[in-house]
């Protein structure tokens, strides 16, 4: 289907950014879905997926069994959004994050990028997909996000691209080595997601999602679609590498 194809393409682009291939040890963190992990197994990579969401873990593991990928992908629970060095010690050739940075508080963003720095091997690559604010963002646009912050993502804040560069430069030994704007692709994906959800409202109701939740989910798709159509937000894939071959400072 069109939506599935779009999601697979976006995942493949991030895997290309991180040079994921046969033998790569990939970390998907924090988990936002299984598409990057599933696509990585097609390249014969070994994948760890980290999440702090207990409910998400059971759904992910069920999906892995259905796909026959439970031998190549390992889903692990971490105590919080960002694990400290004692809670997770792994080192990885590649790290992928999809649309999580914008949902973190300012302090969590700093801790997150330090964790990526810590987890990434000296010659590894990280790929981060994030929604960002553009110079076209207005006060009205910012105000509209308050609803998403109140009911969906409490810490939601779309950073400027320059702010993400500053985050990386000031809090890690990493640097952004590539930046690809994929807003046009993302906008079409949003439209497809909204259409798919609207076409399956009965199934959502049967699964236990009440009318308020269903309307809220349709609203968040429509709002993000509107902000992107107006050019107030963009979708960007960043490629990161260590500044020197020595890796972590």
Whereabouts are the PLM-identified features?
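Conserved alpha-helix/loop element of class I SAM-dependent methyltransferases that forms part
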Residues: 1-25
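Conserved SAM-binding strand-loop segment of SAM-dependent methyltransferases
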Residues: 67-84
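A short acidic, Gly/Pro-enriched loop at the edge of an enzyme's catalytic core
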Residues: 83-96
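A short glycine-rich, Lys/Arg-flanked "PGG" loop and its adjoining helix->strand segment in the class I
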Residues: 110-125
